[in-house]
């Protein structure tokens, strides 16, 4: 198997599991005989967003271009942190996590904003390698 084919396979696997964890973590882990609580579903959704980020990196890395991989890393950071911010915002507002959840919302939201700024905002003038 060539590297390109392997990374395409890795993209598909990561996208499928990432989406499943993001959208329906309880249903996915129930296939393995595991039961999640509402609070542990939050962790499953966060894992899903990170796995989706890896899918983006794998997809861009399949062609081996340094600039494309770097752009994919920036996009993966934006998507994973943006989704984590939204997931944690919901968990904090609904009381699934305590008040410290607001700190994590700010951290992930700030990171998402930074990834957006350096990908699409005024910081975009930074030359990608």
Predicted regions and their residues:
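Membrane-helix boundary elements
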Residues: 3-6, 17-42
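Hydrophobic alpha-helical transmembrane segments of polytopic
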Residues: 6-13, 47, 73-80, 100, ...
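Core segments of alpha-helical transmembrane spans in multipass integral membrane proteins
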Residues: 15-22, 40-62, 75-86
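Membrane-embedded alpha-helical segments of multi-pass transporters/permeases
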Residues: 22, 59, 89, 113-119
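Non-cytosolic membrane-interface motifs at loop->transmembrane helix junctions
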Residues: 33-41, 72, 96-107
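Membrane-helix boundary connector in multi-pass membrane proteins
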Residues: 86-103, 120-121
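Membrane-water interface at the C-terminal end of transmembrane alpha helices
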Residues: 110-129
């Amino acid at each position: 198997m060539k590297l390109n084919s392997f990374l395409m396979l890795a993209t598909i696997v990561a996208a499928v599991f990432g989406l499943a964890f993001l959208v329906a973590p309880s249903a996915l882990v129930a296939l393995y005989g595991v039961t999640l609580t509402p609070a542990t579903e939050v962790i499953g959704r966060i894992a899903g967003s990170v796995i989706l980020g890896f899918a983006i990196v794998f997809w861009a890395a399949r062609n081996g271009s340094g600039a494309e991989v770097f752009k994919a890393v920036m996009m993966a950071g934006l998507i994973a942190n943006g989704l984590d911010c939204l997931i944690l915002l919901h968990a904090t507002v609904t009381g699934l996590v305590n008040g410290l959840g607001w700190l994590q919302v700010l951290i992930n939201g700030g990171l998402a904003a930074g990834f957006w700024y350096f990908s699409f905002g005024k910081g975009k003038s930074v030359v990608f390698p």
